Amino acid sequence: MTAIADSAGGAGETVLVAGGQDWQQVVDAARSADPGERIVVNMGPQHPSTHGVLRLILEIEGETVVEARCGIGYLHTGIEKNLEYRYWTQGVTFVTRMDYLSPFFNETAYCLGVEKLLGITDEIPERVNVIRVLMMELNRISSHLVALATGGMELGAMTPMFVGFRAREIVLTLFEKITGLRMNSAYIRPGGVAQDLPPNAATEIAEALKQLRQPLREMGELLNENAIWKARTQGVGYLDLTGCMALGITGPILRSTGLPHDLRKSEPYCGYQHYEFDVITDDSCDAYGRYMIRVKEMWESMKIVEQCLDKLRPGPTMISDRKLAWPADLQVGPDGLGNSPKHIAKIMGSSMEALIHHFKLVTEGIRVPAGQVYVAVESPRGELGVHMVSDGGTRPYRVHYRDPSFTNLQSVAAMCEGGMVADLIAAVASIDPVMGGVDR
């Protein structure tokens, strides 16, 4: 907050200006320009076209964007700091809420880091890896559907918005049946998953894939060759390979330059090397190319999910080492709150040593050897990386997320400066930022 004293016309006046970062320099530069030619406009943080609480500081001349800056931090939640006060397993509940449109990717990246520090990456059961891939690819479909639905809505295409959200409900219903929650389920755990798939899960997933085909086809029929849609997106938000490399851009934006960069292929994890799928690219470098990549990636994700159903074999859903395995067979009591009498009897009926170990595991958590690792997964928005540091205790010393939304937002100026204000809406929609991941 800055106080500016002004004595225009002999009357003293104090103006309080709320600013952040280089906001004052932006205002000073605008004031020094010729009067009536350029104005500074705040687009957001409460604006329907900024995908959340994103603030865009625009300097415009007529309808042309001369300068564009991003103002972030309005959704800061302190998740990374909170992780330092929670056990390693409890951290999953926090990280799943970062990028809230792709929670399974947040959870998987975190768990892969913990498992790498523990040195148990190769001990993860095969069924666990298949379930993780299954959930991530279903999550990729639901995330892309939101990107296309909201992007269409912002450009005036209301029907694709209804189609996209209706299709997303199919996926979220699956998540609820498998994990108990539609979003932020904390289902992926270090060493495995919280619980096995329900008995009829494979049948329901296969049926959901059949239901998804119609809305995906309908989305393509509505937009792929739509003249208005192409006019609003082709040649808009242009960013070539050189710009992407300079800014560290990943995901559909990078692949729209023709570079087939996908961590599922270049640095496989969770057994992705055993799945057949194509890395979708485009060479248009614009918003339309990114749209087409997301449309085609949903079909590739469906292919991967079908392969997951074929690979599902009976087996454990948690590592066998009981010193590390979080109790994953909890049963809810008849009141829906506490543990069931059957589960309590199982714990209390075991040996005293087993009971003590169970108590210490739940109340103190596991100890992770000292060290630091970096792991990354290919999220719907690009490279989601985790830098994890352990001091040998039961809590993380530091966990830092490299969220693709944060990095990709750096391209707003390169995409939008020199273009029209209306085209800025399409450019930001093609970036598909999620502010929960940006601010954390």
UniProtKB/Swiss-Prot annotation:
Protein location: Cell membrane
Positions of modified residues (N-acetylthreonine): 2
One GO cellular component term noted in the UniProt record for this chain: plasma membrane
EC number: 7.1.1.-
Tagged with keyword Repressor: no
Gene3D superfamilies in the cross-refs: Cytochrome-c3 Hydrogenase, chain B (1.10.645.10)
Pfam families reported for this sequence: Complex1_49kDa (PF00346)
Topology versus the membrane: Peripheral membrane protein
Keywords: Acetylation, Cell membrane, Membrane, NAD, Quinone, Translocase, Transport
Superkingdom of origin: Bacteria
Gene Ontology MF term list: NAD binding; NADH:ubiquinone reductase (non-electrogenic) activity; quinone binding
Cysteines joined through disulfide linkages: none
Catalytic activity entry: a quinone + NADH + 5 H(+)(in) = a quinol + NAD(+) + 4 H(+)(out)
Complexes and interactors: NDH-1 is composed of 14 different subunits. Subunits NuoB, C, D, E, F, and G constitute the peripheral sector of the complex.
PANTHER family: NADH DEHYDROGENASE [UBIQUINONE] IRON-SULFUR PROTEIN 2, MITOCHONDRIAL, NADH-UBIQUINONE OXIDOREDUCTASE 49 KDA SUBUNIT
Family that this chain belongs to: Belongs to the complex I 49 kDa subunit family.
Function, in words: NDH-1 shuttles electrons from NADH, via FMN and iron-sulfur (Fe-S) centers, to quinones in the respiratory chain. The immediate electron acceptor for the enzyme in this species is believed to be a menaquinone. Couples the redox reaction to proton translocation (for every two electrons transferred, four hydrogen ions are translocated across the cytoplasmic membrane), and thus conserves the redox energy in a proton gradient.
HAMAP family in the record: NDH1_NuoD
Protein name according to UniProt: NADH-quinone oxidoreductase subunit D
Protein source organism: Mycobacterium tuberculosis (strain ATCC 25618 / H37Rv)
Name of encoding gene: nuoD
